[in-house]
């Protein structure tokens, strides 16, 4: 699956960083680190892009697809599933990535980063299905 490759790559990038110097302590730090990596790869990256219902964490535009990432942070294993559900619901309710989509494929991914010292990676993710909202 395409989204699995993306998440694995992000986890490799995050694992390569010096955690003492660049600790991921919250969602905004995670978002910034991923943004810097994606910009360094010369991708068209939008962070906190507004639509009429809210702001998506990260949007990456490619020629034939758009990838939307909704990130959640926790440092507790027992919160991961709830955070994943929250991210998925937010993507669906807010319609992230639908604006000016054109004929690109839309890939929406809900992600949970666990900052616990024994984890320090994206531990749960899910490709969001059936979130297309009719635009009138």
Where are these regions (language model features)?
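Structural signature of nuclease core domains in nucleic-acid processing machines
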Residues: 2-136
């Amino acid at each position: 699956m395409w989204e699995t490759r993306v998440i694995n790559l992000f986890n490799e990038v995050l694992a390569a960083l010096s955690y003492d110097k660049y600790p991921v302590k919250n969602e905004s730090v995670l978002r910034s680190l991923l943004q810097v990596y994606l910009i360094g790869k010369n991708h068209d990256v939008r962070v906190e892009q507004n639509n009429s219902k809210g702001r998506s964490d990260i949007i990456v535009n490619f020629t034939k697809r758009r990838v939307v990432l909704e990130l959640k942070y926790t440092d507790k294993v027992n919160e991961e599933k709830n955070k994943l559900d929250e991210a998925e619901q937010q993507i669906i309710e807010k319609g992230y990535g639908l604006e000016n989509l054109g004929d690109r494929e839309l890939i929406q991914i809900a992600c949970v980063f666990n900052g616990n010292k024994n984890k320090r990676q994206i531990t749960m993710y899910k490709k969001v299905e059936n979130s297309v909202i009719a635009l009138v």
